[in-house]
């Protein structure tokens, strides 16, 4: 008997795979408006500063395929097929949905490689996928909407922080900054849970790592007229130093799951500039990337959704 196929739609922001792709990528982010030459060269300069191109594309593919393999090892009566859908560069989310349809996939589970729910992020990804699937008559997509408090996600970061603290002599003079990508402030007034979820993640990790000196901050804000959520991690670093005279700063960009421009430049370069300026030590624990412990975390998240799908199918088949 043939195994039932399940589509595993893994969605992420995407990144250019070469410097030649940067302009098209940036134009897509700007809703079709080409960036000025100055803005384009600034972005290209940032990529060059981290080695020429971001490792994100390679890492995202590894995460998606390793997750799919893991799911197939657990749910042996099903066949999970991997589909990668990106927000701002090919393969786009819509490409992945159309490919599932062509492959005859009738049911799919979607996961966004970002832990915190926001109308700007996870909701937007899932809406794009579900909207098209409904227009073309399938597949039925079961979305995972958030996983900011997943125990294995929390324990990953707690362990990273504990490891980092072994390198610090005066632990009372160290502070952890948990961060995520800033978004326009207007989402808060609309009741978006994004900020509260980051705070909850930070509280859970801090408790698991047994640390008292920590706070949340925001990074990589867009250059638009609208105000974005703050404080920015660089400003926050200066403020914390002025108020507490911390000697060590540990940056945990928990809103991201892989090394990419926002971590390798915005944290490892820009935040380090500030810590050098105030003569403090800079630390940034390892990102989850495609480490087996993080793949186990993602597998746990998708498995919970898969069990819901199976239970739903049983109810429908028994009626």
From Swiss-Prot:
Keywords: Cytoplasm, Heme biosynthesis, Iron, Lyase, Metal-binding, Porphyrin biosynthesis. It catalyses: Fe-coproporphyrin III + 2 H(+) = coproporphyrin III + Fe(2+). This is Coproporphyrin III ferrochelatase 2. The gene is cpfC2. It is an enzyme of class 4 (lyase). HAMAP family: Ferrochelatase. Its EC number is 4.99.1.9. It is found in: Cytoplasm. One of its GO terms (molecular function) is ferrochelatase activity. Involved in coproporphyrin-dependent heme b biosynthesis. Catalyzes the insertion of ferrous iron into coproporphyrin III to form Fe-coproporphyrin III. Pfam families: Ferrochelatase (PF00762). Fe(2+) binds at residues 181, 262. It comes from the Bacteria. Pathway: Porphyrin-containing compound metabolism; protoheme biosynthesis. The keyword Cytoplasm applies. Fe-coproporphyrin III binds at residues 13, 30, 46-47, 54, 125. CDD domains: Ferrochelatase_C, Ferrochelatase_N. One of its GO terms (biological process) is heme biosynthetic process. PROSITE patterns: FERROCHELATASE. One of its GO terms (cellular component) is cytoplasm. Belongs to the ferrochelatase family.
């Amino acid at each position: 008997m043939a195994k039932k196929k399940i589509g595993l739609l893994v969605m992420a922001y995407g990144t250019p795979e070469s410097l030649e792709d940067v302009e098209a990528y940036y134009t897509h982010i700007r809703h079709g408006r080409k960036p000025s030459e100055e803005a384009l060269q600034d972005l290209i300069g940032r990529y060059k500063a981290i080695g020429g191109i971001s490792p994100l594309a390679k890492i995202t593919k590894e995460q998606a395929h390793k997750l799919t393999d893991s799911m197939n090892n657990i749910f042996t009566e099903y066949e999970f097929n991997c589909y990668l859908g990106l927000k701002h560069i090919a393969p786009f989310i819509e490409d992945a949905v159309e490919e599932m349809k062509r492959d005859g996939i009738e049911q799919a589970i979607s996961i966004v490689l970002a832990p915190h729910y926001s109308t700007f992020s996870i909701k937007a990804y899932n809406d794009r996928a579900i909207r098209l699937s409904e227009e073309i008559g399938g597949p039925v997509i079961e979305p995972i909407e958030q996983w900011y408090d997943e125990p294995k996600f929390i324990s990953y970061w707690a362990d990273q922080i504990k490891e980092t603290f072994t390198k610090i002599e005066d632990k009372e003079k160290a502070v952890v900054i948990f961060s995520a990508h800033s978004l326009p402030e207007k989402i808060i007034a609309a009741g978006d849970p994004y900020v509260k979820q980051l705070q909850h993640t930070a509280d859970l990790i801090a408790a698991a790592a047994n640390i008292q000196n920590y706070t949340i901050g925001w990074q990589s804000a867009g250059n638009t007229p609208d105000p974005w959520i703050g404080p920015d991690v660089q400003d926050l670093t200066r403020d914390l130093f002025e108020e507490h005279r911390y000697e060590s700063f540990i940056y945990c960009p928990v809103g991201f799951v892989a090394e990419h421009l926002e971590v390798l430049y915005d944290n490892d370069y820009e935040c380090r500039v500030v810590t050098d300026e105030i003569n403090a030590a800079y630390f940034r624990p390892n990102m989850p990337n495609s480490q087996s412990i993080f793949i186990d975390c993602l597998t746990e998240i998708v498995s919970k959704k898969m069990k819901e799908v199976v239970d739903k199918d049983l109810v429908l088949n028994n009626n």
